[in-house]
């Protein structure tokens, strides 16, 4: 647990990117949850009344929602990449500083290429974990909370 706390200490200057990334995932999730409601409305009102103008209007609104979901998804990717790779750069910098403190007798036990490979591979794995794992960790609770909220909004007697 102490190792996790120590690693988390390097995220300091990237907290803003992590928060903005989480916000973008929540907004994207909201747009994705609104589109099925719009489709139901399109069918219940537009198709049932044969109102072509209403169908085109709802279709356009759904297209805008889909584009906004795409944009927020791309912004999430940008923020998550900046946070994870910036964090990884700080970890590598700390690792290299620690290796520089080794005595010559300790350095003789390791090849230079072995040290570099170990440090870069481990940090790359952690970067990819943060970059790809942050989305589902944020998206799951967002879907749950927004889904429950929308279900109560659609049917308050529920």
Language-model-derived ranges and their functions:
Residues 37, 41, 78, 82, ...:
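Transmembrane alpha-helix boundary and packing residues in multipass membrane permease domains
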Residues 37, 102, 110:
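Short beta-to-alpha loop/turn elements within the nucleotide-binding domains of ABC transporters
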Residues 122:
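Short phosphate-coordinating micro-motif centered on Lys-Gly-acidic
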Residues 17-27, 41, 65, 71, ...:
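Transmembrane helices of ABC transporter permease
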Residues 91-92, 106-112:
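Transmembrane helix boundary and interhelical loop/hinge segments in multi-pass membrane proteins
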Residues 42-46:
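Helix-to-coil boundary motifs at intracellular loop junctions of multi-pass secondary transporters
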């Amino acid at each position: 647990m102490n190792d996790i706390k120590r690693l988390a200490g390097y995220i300091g200057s990237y907290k803003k990117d992590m928060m903005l990334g989480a916000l973008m995932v929540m907004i994207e999730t909201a747009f994705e949850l609104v589109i099925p409601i719009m489709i139901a409305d399109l069918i219940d009102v537009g198709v049932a009344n044969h109102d072509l103008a209403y169908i085109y209007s709802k279709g356009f609104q759904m297209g805008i929602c889909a584009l906004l979901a795409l944009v927020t998804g791309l912004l999430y990717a940008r923020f998550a990449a900046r946070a994870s790779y910036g964090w990884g750069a700080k970890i590598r910098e700390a690792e290299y500083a620690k290796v520089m403190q080794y005595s010559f007798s300790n350095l003789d036990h390791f090849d230079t290429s072995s040290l570099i490979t170990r440090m870069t591979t481990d940090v790359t794995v952690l970067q990819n974990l943060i970059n790809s794992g942050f989305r589902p960790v944020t998206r799951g609770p967002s879907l749950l909370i927004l889904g429950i909220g929308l279900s109560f909004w659609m049917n308050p007697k529920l």
